[in-house]
Each structure stands twice: as C-alpha cells, then as structure tokens.
Amino acid sequence: MNQRRSANPSGKYLMALDAGTGSVRAVIFDLEGNQIAAGQAEWIHQPVPDVPGSMEFDLATNWQLVCQCIRQALKTAQLPASAIQGVASCSMREGIVLYNRNGEPIWACANVDARSSQEVSELKALYDSTFEYDVYRCSGQTLALGAMPRLLWLAHHRPDIYHQATALTMISDWLANMLSGELAVDPSNAGTTGMLDLVSRDWRPDLLEMAGLRSDILSPVKETGTLLGYVTEKAAVQCGLNIGTPVIMGGGDVQLGCLGLGVVKPAQTAVIGGTFWQQVVNLPEPVTDPNMNTRINPHVIPGMVQAESISFFTGLTMRWFRDAFCAEEKLLAERLGVDTYSLLEDMAARVPAGAYGVIPIFSDVMRFKAWYHAAPSFINLSIDPEKCNKATLFRALEENAAIVSACNLDLISAFSAVKPDSLVFAGGGSKGKLWSQILSDVTGLPVRVPMVKESTALGCAIAAGVGVGLYDAMGATGEKLVRWQHEYQPNPEHCEVYQKAKQDWQAIYADQLTLVDHGLTTSLWKAPGL
C-alpha cells in the first residue's frame, strides 16, 4: 500500500472500516488514495455448543474491537477526528445480522456459518426441486451460502429470535448502523443473500414467501456511495469519531476491492489471491450460468454485475505447505530478513515449467450447484530427489492455483461470451513475482499487479469520498487512483506446457472426485446440503 507521511495540503481524509473473516481494520486514506494509518484487530467466530457447523458473530465483543481499531488508526495518523470527512464500511459477504423492533442487533452469523445443511436440503426439494434454480436465475446465488436456509434454521431451532426479528442487514451495514443508528443494505453485499434481484437491485420478497419465510424483515436498499446518516453522540463516545461525521453506504469486500483496483468496466477481470482465490469478471448486463457453476453478484457500479468463481483454500494450502514442510526455510528466511514465501519462490524458479509433471489435487473449479472437492493430495510424484523435492512441490502448487483460476475463467467465458484481454492480480498472492508470471503463462494473458495491496479498503474509502462529494464518480475515481507496480507478459513456450498440464489436471481431478463419491477419501470441503 502507498504510505506517505508527508503533509496533506487539503487536510481532508477518509476512513474505511473493513470487516474481514479473520480481522477488522480501520484504515485512513488521503484524497490521493495513499494509506495514512490503520488499526487492526483479529476476531474469532466461535461455534455454538451442540450446533454443528455454526459460527456465531459476537456483536458486543466485535463492536468493541471496531472502536479500538478506529481509535488506533486516528492515534497512529496523529489526526484529530475532525479531519475525517466521511466513513464507509465493507465486510465479508454472506454474514447476516438481525435486529429487533427497537433497532437493536440481536443475532448474527459469519460468512462461514454452515449450521443450516438440513435446511438447504429442505429448500432444494421445494417445487419439485426447482426452487434453487428459480433463486439462482433471479439472484445469481444458490442456497448453499444464502440467508434463507439460515433464517429457516432460526425458525426451526430459535423461534424466539426469528419472531423478534424486524430487520435484516449484512455485517458491513451493521457497522454503519452502529455508527449512525440507521438501517439499510447495499446491493453488492445484500446480493449474496440470494434474496435480491440482479436486474432491479432490490429485494425479491416473493422468494422468501415461496420458502415459507417472513418477508417483512427486509431493510431498505441504498446504493454504495450514498449517504446513510451521521455518527451519533453514543457512537462518537465509543469510537472516537466526531459527532455528525457522514456515514456512507459501503458494500461487499470483493466488489469494493475491484473498485480499488480500477476494475469498473465491462470485461475487466481480476484474480484476487487470498485464503480463497476469487476470479471476477465484469459483465455488461445481468446474465446467469445455465449450468449454475458460477455465482453472479451485483457490482458496486450500478447496472453492472460480476461473475465470480472461487478457488477454495488456495492461500491456506500454501501456508499449510510452508508450515508443515519448510521449517528449515522459515528459519533461514528469518535470519536473512526475508519472507519465507519469497525464499521458496527463489527455489521454485529453478524448477522447469510443469514441475516435472507433479499434479496437486486441492481445490476444484467452482461448481456452485453441487460444490465439493476431492481429497487433498499430490499425484505423479517420483522418488528422484533431484526432481521431486520441496521446490518442485511449491512450484506445482503455484502452477495449480493458476490452472484452477484459468479453468474458472473458461467457465465464465463459456456462458457469458466475455473474454478478458488482460488480468489484474491482487491480494497476498500477487506479492509473488514467480506466481504472477505463472498466472500470465497459464492464462496466456498479460497480468498487471497494482501497487495498492489493500484494494478493498481503498475501494471503501472511494465510496466514502463520493458520498461526501469529494470525488465525482466511483468508477472514474477507482481508475484514477490505482497505480501499477508491474506487468507480466506470457511466455509462449510455457503457455504450451501449461495447456497440457491443465488438460491432465482436469482428467485426474475428475477421477479423484469418484473416490470421494465412493466414500474412500474425504473431501477438502463440501457445501451445506450435499
């Protein structure tokens, strides 16, 4: 991230609150998009005793952490609260919050909550098993990660909460509510509930009614970058912001991340490499996948949607490999003062493209309708230590992540007819120079890596700036503020190697899935209801 401590002539700053799966951040930017300071705190989503798959979002504790982060960011920046011209919030998608008639939050779950597996199955069976297709065709979402199964679970198991609830929002909107006292949702995040229409960008209460659920809990919809309200006296005392600071509608983390990357026009494409890898393609108009392999989300740019595929646990797989097998490299990296992944990339760069035919089996391509994966493994190892070693396996993992991304982009292109002419690679994965080059070689496309690594927070700050009139338009501002660190061009010889590796992986992965189907191996992950 660009960080500059020089004086800001305008004296005006923007704050973004970024509520991720594992942590929350308050980030301060100047009007040129430079990060000035940040406060961060980790949070944990605890399971509810005797509720398998549950991941409760602790509203009281997590609000205290948010306030702590805001105060920390202001202190680090050495800025008075009056310098903050506006604040917006973004969050992990899918996580929902319920409120009572007094507007008080009473229940919330994180995006990873999977307690409603039985309810997913029940809803799938509705209307001769056509209900999920109707939901997807309208909203771009399947039931696996949606809000309706969770609401049905509450109706079954916590009717006290279900009947108390008078409003529903996403976690980003909860942050804004705690600051302003106002309740609303934005399309980009609320779209992941499976209850919002891709075309109208408004709720579809008939979907809840078809599921036998209440439709009177849907909060007003406001677009990203519009004014929600102002910081209240109570919130100001708690978090340190000034009373009356404008609170602007934020949105979903990936969509705001794309705004921060300047991915705001049709056909522009990003690969965001974190714990999960998202492959995101801007579509010029709402369209869904007849095979239901890909999720479709509203962009923060009105009128535009994004096809999004997800590779599972890509970053987590690399961390597992580092921690399980590379203790020696971790010690060496510490002594040299370098990142362990950088050291492993230097080793892997000496391994030829194709990694001597080693095929990692971890995440499958995204199959949203029936989403599960094979058991983790490496296929086609040899016992030649010169060819099969840590460097080879590390390179094979990087190549495999790029291959799965390319396959997901192929699936999007097949139903949308949108073919990107370049990629933006962002997130933690883009720090790897070798990984960036491999992604270019596998896809055959130029790959641009931005200087800004925290693009989600920047996109959120842009929304805040538009909402208070400091920027004219979100899309144009995103394009203006993004700066590029490097562009990688595909190596034609490597492209040929990877085309064969891609075909081999697809065939081998299909066979590995049959082992899971027969109960012989354990899936890396499977969606609720399967």
From Swiss-Prot:
Domain of life: Bacteria
One of the GO BP terms on file: quorum sensing
Chief localization: cytoplasm
Enzyme class, UniProt record, top EC level: transferase
Keyword NAD among record annotations: no
Keyword Transmembrane helix: no
Keywords annotated in UniProt: Cytoplasm, Kinase, Transferase
GO molecular function, a single term: autoinducer-2 kinase activity
EC number assigned by the record: 2.7.1.189
Residues spanning the membrane: none
Subcellular location(s) per record: Cytoplasm
Record InterPro entries: AI-2_kinase, ATPase_NBD, Carb_kinase_FGGY, FGGY_C, FGGY_Carb_Kinase, FGGY_N
Catalytic activity: (S)-4,5-dihydroxypentane-2,3-dione + ATP = (2S)-2-hydroxy-3,4-dioxopentyl phosphate + ADP + H(+)
One matching Pfam family: FGGY_C
Gene3D superfamilies assigned to the protein according to its UniProt record, in alphabetical order: 3.30.420.40
Gene Ontology cellular-component terms listed: cytoplasm
Family to which the UniProt record says this protein belongs: Belongs to the FGGY kinase family.
Role of this protein: Catalyzes the phosphorylation of autoinducer-2 (AI-2) to phospho-AI-2, which subsequently inactivates the transcriptional regulator LsrR and leads to the transcription of the lsr operon. Phosphorylates the ring-open form of (S)-4,5-dihydroxypentane-2,3-dione (DPD), which is the precursor to all AI-2 signaling molecules, at the C5 position.
Protein name: Autoinducer-2 kinase
Source species: Photorhabdus laumondii subsp. laumondii (strain DSM 15139 / CIP 105565 / TT01)
